[in-house]
Amino acid sequence: MAEVLRLEQIKKSYNVGTAVETEVLHGIDLLMQSGDFLALMGPSGSGKSTLLNIIGLLDRPTSGLLAIDGVDTATLGDAALTQLRGQTIGFIFQYHYLISAFTACENVMMPMLVDRGHPDAEMRARAEQLLDRVGLSRWRDNNAANMSGGQQQRVAIARALAMDPDLVLADEPTGNLDSKSADAVFELMRQINRERGTTFLIVTHNDELAKRCDRIVTVVDGRVA
């Protein structure tokens, strides 16, 4: 299988108004291949969010190797890093961050609009196809504000897949949902993983959902436990 993500000795330090640096990640190693479905767990303050921001190319490590699809991200400038993020990584958050005045279809089109600059028929067709995949064809022209929490998160999943990413980062994607909706959203991600071979890294505090992943990585005090 193709290698999607490689972390070698990733460290991250911050200097917050003092001359002394505080290291929050201490040499993280992680390898993910195409089709992996991994849970990332750990207590609050363990470094999970910092690690996810680095993997998502929203922040840079202080040192260590971060490679996405075999590309050493340390060799890239900010513009190239933004392009790599947009083309290879999809994001799903605990809160859906949909634009409430936009329809489901318009929300799914947003990553494509950012990439291409203007809407077209191909973009619309792609969004409709993804909404069909997440079971929301009938609601594609509904405003996001008029949808249930479970439906909104399904739209967010469709949006994360808009650019056909190799890696999807899901940060507590079921955290705001009731147990029935959470299970349905988890199963949807699992089905997409199996059908499309999309790699998923899911941050969760839900032990039962984590056990249904292929692998669990636990971060404690900035280290893989």
Curated annotation (Swiss-Prot):
UniProt name for this protein: Lipoprotein-releasing system ATP-binding protein LolD 2
Database matches in PANTHER family: IMPORT ATP-BINDING PROTEIN (PTHR24220), LIPOPROTEIN-RELEASING SYSTEM ATP-BINDING PROTEIN LOLD (PTHR24220:SF689)
Cited SUPFAM superfamilies: P-loop containing nucleoside triphosphate hydrolases (SSF52540)
InterPro entries: AAA+_ATPase, ABC_transporter-like_ATP-bd, ABC_transporter-like_CS, ABC_transpr_LolD-like, MacB-like_ATP-bd, P-loop_NTPase
Bilayer topology term: Peripheral membrane protein
GO molecular function, one term: ATP binding
Organism: Rhodopseudomonas palustris (strain BisB18)
Name of the gene: lolD2
Top EC group: translocase
Subcellular location: Cell inner membrane
SMART domains according to UniProt: AAA
Assembly and oligomerization: The complex is composed of two ATP-binding proteins (LolD) and two transmembrane proteins (LolC and LolE).
Sorted UniProt keywords: ATP-binding, Cell inner membrane, Cell membrane, Membrane, Nucleotide-binding, Translocase, Transport
GO-annotated biological processes: lipoprotein localization to outer membrane; protein localization to outer membrane
